[in-house]
């Protein structure tokens, strides 16, 4: 029986493209190969689609393969990348010849795979699994395109996605329904840019009075804690810096820049021009456009010798900033999934233990910078309250299939929910798989659940949803056959742990091997934990949720 062709959409033009790329790779690895044929569809910086050659799926980051070093045109090889000294890297939008020409974009994509139109995608896949993040990925844009072409897709629909990307709209809806919301206000970019110092000082006083001198500043349309600042008893300069950062603006001061040595300046430029830690490229410096890190470095070197500051402004900026009260309490994240009938069920919430005040991009995606404790360590009755609250909010926003809802619970049990997301990070250590393991689902099984419930949601909500019934029937037949063949799989023991100083590495490697084998057509992995010492040891069958503990 023919497998279901699942196009995995990952990458994209947003600031969260690297999170998407890593998550898409996880889906590609872990999707059940008995049922599905995974098709990696890379979305580039300009929104073009590309059937990605499999070897590039395993690159560490997008910039490691795209844009490529060379392109081949009419039998000739020509250089694609400009001179990039000091180990600088750029995304494709920093190369003007590519950014300004559709033909060049296609030439570049030909080096890493096969460019596809949406019409070609329509004929190549049966279902779209969306691992995209941020703008154009979880804001209703790609969902609308797929609806137009009648391609069923994973997750929430257009309206819920559009609401899920806008933190200010979320807060407004929560306030209207009195749903677990803290105090907040908003500030438009146009108002901030046109304000003089007196007006900015008035906002500074207003927000300090409103929020008791402890508040959070965040962009309204960004995820992964990009552009977020936590302010505690700030002075006016710190306040202005935080607001500017949320709008992806930054002042570089000569007094600080000129004190640094060459290595420190190069490091600063790398951080400034990285979408994950800074403004990204292209950007404006005092109104002048810069596409390359080296050109920006040269400009700052020359200009800051004669003037006190340079103002940097990202092309990929923000239109609105959210200012909200700081909440004291335990931070958590909760995945809510729908059952076959669309009814929400909240998985055991995870407590986030971080080294600093902010669960920032690095803490979220780099190992060792935060710990996840599942379920959160509070009174069991409060865990029930959290799960019920998350389900309530899920229904209020009209989410479908699954969502990730973050929040805080105070010392007296009051719950605040913020940043409801219509998608979740899908890397191996993410909340998405961490919490699924608590109810006995490995990544392969959980992805299958998301697929089936997404297909049912599209049947229910798409104007021509009945056309997807045959795909659902085919999928159900495939899974019935797969269950019948499961006893024929070769059982493979994956032994991890041990008693050496590297046992934590063994656990991580063992998890990765277990997860990849779980999606295999031929093998059934069995997780085994080894304990003891050099004189004696014991072997334990490791429960799935224990294997995913930090």
Regions found by a protein language model. Name each.
Residues 1-176, 187-202, 449, 453-550:
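ATP-binding N-terminal substructure of ATP-dependent carboxylate-amine bond-forming enzymes
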Residues 44-46, 233, 338-343, 410-413, ...:
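Short acidic-glycine loop/turn motifs at beta-strand connectors
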Residues 50-80, 226, 230-288, 535-550:
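Internal, charge-rich low-complexity segments
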Residues 146, 324-325, 334, 394-427, ...:
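Conserved metal-phosphate-binding beta-hairpin within the catalytic cores
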Residues 176-225, 229:
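Rossmann-like NAD(P)H-binding beta-loop-alpha module
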Residues 187, 228-234, 336-339, 410, ...:
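Short beta-strand-to-turn element immediately C-terminal to the catalytic PLP-Schiff-base lysine
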Residues 237-373, 377, 414-416:
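Phosphate-binding site of ATP-dependent enzymes
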Residues 350-403, 431-475:
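Active-site "cap" helix and flanking loop/linker of ATP-utilizing ligase/carboxylase catalytic domains
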